[in-house]
Amino acid sequence: MTVKKIALVAHDRMKKELIEWIKKHQNLLKHHELYATGSTGQAIEKTLNVTVTKMESGPLGGDLQLGAKIVNKEIDILIFFWDPLEAQPHDPDVRALLRIAVVWNLPVACNASTADYLLTSPLFDSDYHPETPDYEAYRNRII
């Protein structure tokens, strides 16, 4: 089994759903490196009795800290249970995190069923590395 670096994030009204999902998959998740934003990380530690690398709370920059880890290839999977029914004060940060995950072709799940698909994929236990997009032309563009 290849150890994955998994970022787990949930908006306040979605934390209970994420924790229930984590309980369902705790035997698998406890063998991986887990990262999370503030209070989500605390809840995960309490649930799994494992150490979670905690960022700041989302509104205090935790989403952006995870985004930086994605850019630096320090995260393999993002599981983000975001609340589709409530506006967030840090919505630009949420969009930035999701955008940067797509930019770097990172596997992302935004609900339990998609997260189930990720964890049960045959690629999950392999040494799979998503193809990194080639942004050289963008980096070298003349403005």
Curated annotation (Swiss-Prot):
One annotated Gene Ontology cellular component of this protein: cytosol
InterPro entries assigned: Methylgl_synth, Methylglyoxal_synth_AS, MGS-like_dom, MGS-like_dom_sf
Matching SUPFAM superfamilies: Methylglyoxal synthase-like
PROSITE patterns with a match to the protein in the record: METHYLGLYOXAL_SYNTH, MGS
SMART domains documented for this protein: MGS
One Pfam assignment: MGS
Organism: Coxiella burnetii (strain RSA 493 / Nine Mile phase I)
Entries under CDD domains matching the protein: MGS (cd01422)
Annotated MGS-like domain residues: 1-143
Taxonomic placement: Bacteria, Pseudomonadati, Pseudomonadota, Gammaproteobacteria, Legionellales
GO biological process: methylglyoxal biosynthetic process
Protein name as it appears in the record: Methylglyoxal synthase
Catalytic residue positions: D63 (proton donor/acceptor)
Binding locations of substrate: H11, K15, T37, G38, S39, T40, S57, G58, H90
GO molecular function terms listed in the Swiss-Prot or TrEMBL record: methylglyoxal synthase activity
The EC number(s) this enzyme carries: 4.2.3.3
